[in-house]
């Protein structure tokens, strides 16, 4: 896959060389091809759903049913009422630190959450550097935790609401975003020289952060975490339960949300998941860590990212959360790349499994082969000399930081995903292509000139590293301004993000989508509260 034509979704579409990969995504390169009329409900750059709705069956005419008595109607209404299990014992603490949220990147599908109209002369799309999102104000909204998916995002507020925004093609937002926006002639708009149009034509119901209805959750439910994949969202509760909505995709299109449900448009409780302490989302798979230190996985397993072999004729079994072959009771942290997974154990070991065709697992065996996968969790020996505290993965690269603040990277290098200039790479640790150009950094390497790193985050082909004193570095692919550096040129090495919006602010987290990114900073004098549904 050429470096300038990467996927449009975070941890989503694999390279052309990825075996059994998910549906190929659009190139990020701009095109001059004519575009048809498009309904305003859907962004021109959204993923096209591959699965068309089945025609409705013809029904024989039947006699009208007799009207129900008042007693029968009341009974039917009671029966239709959602039943939830009782709230269990608290095992998780809800976050309380209120955050300022800064966004940047493309935003043409509403994933920046800036709405659909120009505000104070600024467009809600093509944001080159970090911009404070007033729709997520620390005063009036109060975000305490946030997650970015491929083309959507989700956030948890201090008063226990879940907000979603971005692409809602397969129910990823968990709410109705129908919009009577009418038809737009996109070709005419692109040819227009008028840059002063206040309304971008983006669906305001998708591009404006909006709460998911509480009616889908058990009364008294308190949330502690949300995670977003490419086409789904999941929420973890204080008592270790998990709600989810959306769908998982495979190379054939929509795989399903459960064995019986193709697309879940609104939140539903996943009944088999209990005592969960943390979640992590890949492109189309989820990991969950329980209170005993065990890990379960579900979703699409075509690249063995679930840690178990999936037989094609029984592929829907991958949608059932099942355990992974890790040492029992020892896992303390989980993380996902697009098609690969990681686990950190209490003894300081790092385990990896899933896709490894660009050495993204940090395992040299079969790295560089088109169909390279690691079926079962394998210990990453190259990381044994470091006490890894945080880890993340993109489509074909990964990064981590140690307890000493070191930044380590590995995997695909042709788009500067690993933050090294080519002449600084150690030849013995690199696989070269047929043109003798660096292709894969097989062995995790410490990136020079950055220190005190406390957390890391990866987009498709770009990355972030946050320091203990609240600064943030970015590097990699930047065609849609997703590095926050104000340029569409690749950023070769970790570079400090510095503009008036975040200068002097303490950044404590970075979150990378496909063509957009999010920074979370400590809000000035923000309240620390987290309410309860129905309170």
Describe each PLM feature range.
Residues 393-397, 401-406, 412-416, 436-481:
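Loop/turn-rich, solvent-exposed surfaces of beta-rich toroidal or solenoidal domains
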Residues 156-171, 175-181, 188-349:
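Fungal eukaryote-biased detector of long internal structured cores
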Residues 136-137, 145, 214-218, 258, ...:
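Surface loop/turn motifs at the tips and blade-to-blade linkers of beta-strand repeat domains
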Residues 84-117:
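An edge-strand/N-cap motif at the start of beta-rich repeat modules
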Residues 103, 152-155, 164, 232-235, ...:
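Conserved core positions of repeat-based scaffolds
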Residues 470-472, 477-480, 485-535:
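Blade-level signature of beta-propeller repeat domains, shared across WD40, Kelch, NHL, RCC1
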Residues 131, 147, 155, 227, ...:
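Conserved beta-strand position repeated across blades of beta-propeller domains
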Residues 1-96, 527-535:
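Ser/Thr-rich, low-complexity intrinsically disordered regulatory regions
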């Amino acid at each position: 896959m050429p470096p300038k034509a990467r996927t449009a979704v975070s941890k989503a579409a694999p390279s052309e060389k990825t075996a059994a990969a998910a549906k190929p995504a659009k190139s990020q390169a701009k095109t001059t091809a004519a575009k048809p009329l498009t309904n305003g409900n859907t962004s021109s750059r959204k993923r096209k759903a591959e699965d068309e709705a089945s025609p409705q069956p013809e029904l024989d005419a039947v006699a009208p049913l007799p009207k129900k008595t008042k007693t029968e109607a009341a009974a039917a209404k009671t029966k239709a009422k959602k039943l939830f299990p009782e709230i269990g014992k608290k095992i998780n603490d809800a976050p309380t630190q209120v955050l300022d949220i800064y966004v940047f990147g493309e935003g043409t599908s509403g994933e920046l959450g800036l709405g659909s109209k120009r505000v104070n002369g600024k467009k809600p799309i093509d944001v080159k550097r970090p911009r404070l999102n007033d729709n997520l104000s620390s005063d009036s909204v109060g975000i305490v935790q946030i997650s970015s998916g491929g083309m959507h995002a989700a956030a948890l507020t201090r008063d226990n609401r879940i907000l979603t925004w971005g692409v809602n093609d397969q129910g990823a937002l968990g709410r109705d975003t129908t919009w009577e926006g009418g038809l737009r002639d996109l070709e005419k708009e692109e040819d227009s020289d008028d840059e002063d149009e206040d309304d971008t034509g983006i669906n305001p119901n998708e591009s404006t952060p909006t709460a998911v209805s509480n009616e889908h959750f058990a009364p008294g439910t308190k949330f502690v975490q949300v995670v977003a994949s490419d086409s789904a969202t999941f929420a973890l509760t204080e008592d270790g339960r998990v709600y989810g909505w959306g769908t998982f995709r495979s190379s054939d299109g929509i795989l399903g949300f459960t064995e019986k449900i193709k697309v879940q448009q609104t939140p539903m409780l996943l009944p088999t998941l209990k005592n969960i302490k943390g979640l992590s989302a890949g492109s189309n798979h989820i990991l969950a860590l329980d209170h005993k230190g065990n890990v379960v996985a579900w979703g699409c397993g075509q690249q063995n990212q679930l840690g178990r072999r999936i037989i094609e004729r029984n592929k829907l079994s991958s949608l059932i959360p099942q355990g992974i072959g890790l040492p029992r009771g020892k896992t303390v942290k989980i993380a996902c790349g697009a098609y690969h997974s990681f686990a950190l154990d209490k003894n300081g070991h790092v385990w990896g499994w899933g896709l490894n065709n660009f050495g993204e697992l940090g395992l040299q065996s079969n790295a560089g082969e088109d169909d390279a996968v690691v079926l079962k969790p394998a210990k990453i020996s190259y990381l044994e000399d470091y006490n890894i505290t945080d880890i993340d993965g993109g489509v074909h690269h990964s990064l981590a930081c140690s307890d000493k603040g070191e930044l380590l990277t590995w995997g695909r290098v042709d788009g500067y995903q690993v933050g090294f200039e080519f002449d600084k790479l150690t030849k013995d640790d690199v696989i070269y292509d047929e043109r003798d150009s660096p292709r894969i950094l097989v062995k995790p390497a410490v990136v020079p000139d950055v220190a005190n790193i406390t957390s890391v985050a990866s987009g498709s082909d770009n990355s972030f590293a946050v320091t203990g004193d609240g600064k943030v570095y970015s590097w990699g692919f930047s065609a849609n301004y997703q590095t926050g550096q104000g340029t569409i040129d690749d950023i070769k090495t970790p570079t400090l993000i510095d503009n008036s919006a975040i200068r002097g602010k303490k950044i404590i987290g970075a979150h990378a989508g496909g063509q957009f990114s999010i920074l979370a900073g400590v809000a000035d004098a923000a309240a620390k509260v987290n309410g309860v549904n129905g309170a």
